[in-house]
C-alpha cells in the first residue's frame, strides 16, 4: 500500500518527537543522576524530579516484571497499528495526532522499558495540585489524542454540513 504524503508527515513527526523525548531523558539523567527522587527547582511551580515509572502514562498501572513486558508487547502492537493507520492519513490533524501517539508509545514504552526497565519521568508540577510526574512523551500522547479528537469532530461537522459528500 502506498503511503500518503501526510503519512510521511506523521512518521516525520514521530521521529522528531522520539528524538526530543530521548534527548530530554538523557539530559535529565545527566543533570539529576539516576537516583529516583532527585529534584531541582526550575521556576515557580515547575520542578525537575526524577521518577522511575514502572507503570503507564502518569504512573498508572505500576506492577511486576510481567506487567513491564505486557506493556512493552502491547505498546509494540499499538505502534504497529498506528503506523499502518498513519500510512493512510488524509488530514493534517490526523497525521499530527498519529505521529505524536506513535512517538509516545515507541519512546516511552519500547525504548525506555527495554533500555532501563522503566520509563524516565521528570516534569513535576505537583505544586499546582497535579500529582503525576511526566515526560515529553506523555505530553506528546496527550496532545496527539487531542488532535485526533479535534480531527474527528471537524470531519463529522463536514459530514453533517455536506451529507451527500459534495462541497468538501
Predicted regions and their residues:
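Alpha-helical transmembrane bundles and membrane-interface segments of multipass inner-membrane proteins
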Residues: 1-168
Amino acid at each position: 500500500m502506498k503511503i500518503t504524503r501526510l503519512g510521511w508527515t506523521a512518521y516525520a513527526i514521530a521521529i522528531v518527537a522520539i528524538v526530543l523525548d530521548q534527548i530530554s531523558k538523557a539530559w535529565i539523567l545527566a543533570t539529576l543522576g539516576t537516583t529516583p527522587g532527585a529534584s531541582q527547582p526550575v521556576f515557580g511551580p515547575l520542578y525537575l524530579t526524577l521518577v522511575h515509572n514502572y507503570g503507564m502514562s502518569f504512573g498508572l498501572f505500576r506492577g511486576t516484571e510481567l506487567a513491564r513486558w505486557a506493556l512493552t508487547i502491547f505498546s509494540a502492537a499499538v505502534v504497529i497499528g498506528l503506523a499502518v493507520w498513519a500510512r493512510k492519513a488524509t488530514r493534517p490533524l490526523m497525521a499530527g495526532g498519529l505521529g505524536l501517539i506513535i512517538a509516545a508509545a515507541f519512546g516511552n514504552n519500547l525504548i525506555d522499558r527495554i533500555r532501563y526497565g522503566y520509563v524516565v519521568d521528570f516534569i513535576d508540577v505537583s505544586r499546582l495540585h497535579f500529582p503525576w510526574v511526566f515526560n515529553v512523551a506523555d505530553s506528546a500522547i496527550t496532545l496527539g489524542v487531542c488532535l485526533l479528537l479535534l480531527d474527528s469532530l471537524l470531519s463529522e461537522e463536514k459530514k453533517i454540513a455536506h451529507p451527500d459528500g459534495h462541497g468538501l
